[in-house]
């Protein structure tokens, strides 16, 4: 009987409309995206980048830990030994279509060479443009170095 009375007096509709009316006069929470951008968390996992030392030398020591830990098998590394005996990468590819942005590659890297940066606007029309090679990753690192360094500094206590 009570359910009949509730449906007769349109109780559900009145309840829903009161909820709508409650939020109607509150300030809007949406933003006009291309023109306004919201705050990005320091722990945000975006576009990958390879970092360099202050001297300009790349940080990656070709230990291949990131390749081994990647659950999606999105990273391919080939390395050669230099004249001074140190190993460096000759090929460092990341297939961004396979990547699940878990951050395990960043956690596994002993020298903070591979990081996931603050950029989330890297859409592409072709599959080939989403396969990042070493040069593109180094360019990303050079472009985002200040943001990457501050991001790693903020997260240092929790690592």
Swiss-Prot record:
UniProt-annotated binding residues for [4Fe-4S] cluster 2: 70, 99, 102, 105
Origin superkingdom: Bacteria
Enzyme Commission number, as recorded: 7.1.1.-
Cofactor(s) the protein needs: [4Fe-4S] cluster
Disulfide bonds: none
Keyword field contains DNA repair: no
Cofactor notes: Binds 2 [4Fe-4S] clusters per subunit.
Subcellular location: Cell inner membrane
Role description: NDH-1 shuttles electrons from NADH, via FMN and iron-sulfur (Fe-S) centers, to quinones in the respiratory chain. The immediate electron acceptor for the enzyme in this species is believed to be ubiquinone. Couples the redox reaction to proton translocation (for every two electrons transferred, four hydrogen ions are translocated across the cytoplasmic membrane), and thus conserves the redox energy in a proton gradient.
Oligomeric form and interacting partners: NDH-1 is composed of 14 different subunits. Subunits NuoA, H, J, K, L, M, N constitute the membrane sector of the complex.
Protein name according to UniProt: NADH-quinone oxidoreductase subunit I
Gene name for this UniProt entry: nuoI
């Amino acid at each position: 009987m009570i359910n009949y009375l509730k449906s007769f007096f349109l109780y559900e509709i009145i309840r829903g409309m009161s909820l709508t009316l409650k939020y109607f006069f509150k300030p809007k929470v949406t933003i006009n995206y291309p023109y306004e951008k919201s705050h990005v968390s320091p722990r945000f996992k975006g576009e990958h980048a390879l970092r360099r030392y202050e001297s300009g030398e790349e940080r990656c020591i070709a230990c291949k830990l990131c390749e081994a830990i990647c659950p999606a098998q999105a990273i391919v590394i080939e390395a050669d030994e230099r004249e001074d005996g140190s190993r460096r990468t000759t090929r460092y590819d990341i297939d961004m279509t396979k990547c699940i942005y878990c951050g395990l590659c960043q956690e596994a890297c002993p020298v903070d060479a591979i990081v996931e940066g603050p950029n989330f606007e890297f859409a592409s029309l072709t599959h080939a443009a989403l396969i990042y090679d070493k040069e593109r990753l180094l360019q990303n690192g050079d472009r985002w170095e200040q943001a990457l360094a501050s991001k790693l500094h903020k997260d240092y206590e929790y690592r």
